[in-house]
Structures are given as C-alpha cells and as structure tokens.
Amino acid sequence: MAKKISDPNYKVIAENRRARFDYAIESDLECGIMLEGSEVKALRGGGSNIADSYAAVENGELWLVNAYIPPYEQAKMFKHEERRRRKLLVSRKELANLWNATQRKGMTLVPLVLYFNHKGIAKMKLGIAKGKKIHDKRETEAKRDWNRQKQRLLKDNA
C-alpha cells in the first residue's frame, strides 16, 4: 500500500495501490505535471485513475502515458482527451538519473500518487521500480498475513 502523505494540506487525487504489490520500489521522486484547465477542474472533482499508467523518457522529456482523467462536464468547447499523454516536469539532472535507471534491465517508472500540494498545484510521485515475480508477490502477501496475525495475537494477549 502506498504511504499516505502526512501533511493535511495535501489532497490525494489518485493512488496506485497495486504498484507496491506488483513492483519493488527502489526510490521515488516528486514531479510536476502539465495539465489543461479542464483537466485540473476534473481532478478536483475526482474519479481519475493512474493504476494502468506508466512514465517513459522519450526525446529528452518525461511523459505520463495512459493516465485517466475524466471529462469535465462544464467545459463546453475546450474538453480534454481523457487518456492523452501528459508531460511530467523534472529537472535535467533528475531526468538524466531517471533515464539511466530505466536503461537497467527490468526497471520502469511507475506513478504512485497524484495529489495537490499545499499551494494547490498538481504533483505526481513517481517510483523507480522493478517488476516482481509471482513467487515474490506470494512472499509479500505471506509477510503481510503474518504481520496481521502477530498484531492480532498481541492485541488478544494484552
């Protein structure tokens, strides 16, 4: 499960809860996201989904691919495309680090959380991740079950 952003000034819009189950997250970073006006309004309304999306470095730019932002009903002429590619904003140094990380075998960029920061600006937390094998997923699930059982036993004995 993704870590909750502890500051109450942050408003989480969408969370990729499957990412921590399907991938081993090595590190994460915060980046900005270029949105159209109707997309910002739609995000404030809720209903967006980043579970099927990923990030890719192409031509020296970082892109978010296949993220769903629902249409904003009050936008008449300037409606946005729901699953269009959106540019992610990072510094050149971070972009170089991300590109180097994705060149290693099995590494990918996974969106973890989409949120508004304390200034009301949309931000995304990206994770540099490696896909887990089926036995790794089973192991993670077994550890989680064991931790639940330990907590239950401690609660019952106390």
From Swiss-Prot:
**What keyword terms does UniProt attach to this protein?**
Cytoplasm, RNA-binding
InterPro entries from the xrefs? SmpB, SsrA-bd_prot, SsrA-bd_prot_CS
**Subcellular localization(s) per the UniProt record:** Cytoplasm
Q: Which GO terms describe its cellular component?
A: cytosol
PROSITE patterns according to UniProt:
SSRP
- Sequence ranges of Basic and acidic residues compositional bias: 136-158
Region annotation (Disordered) ranges: 133-158
Kindly list the GO molecular function terms attached to this UniProt entry.
RNA binding
Described function: Required for rescue of stalled ribosomes mediated by trans-translation. Binds to transfer-messenger RNA (tmRNA), required for stable association of tmRNA with ribosomes. tmRNA and SmpB together mimic tRNA shape, replacing the anticodon stem-loop with SmpB. tmRNA is encoded by the ssrA gene; the 2 termini fold to resemble tRNA(Ala) and it encodes a 'tag peptide', a short internal open reading frame. During trans-translation Ala-aminoacylated tmRNA acts like a tRNA, entering the A-site of stalled ribosomes, displacing the stalled mRNA.
Query: What protein family is recorded?
Result: Belongs to the SmpB family.
Name of the featured protein: SsrA-binding protein
Query: Which species?
Result: Ruegeria pomeroyi (strain ATCC 700808 / DSM 15171 / DSS-3)
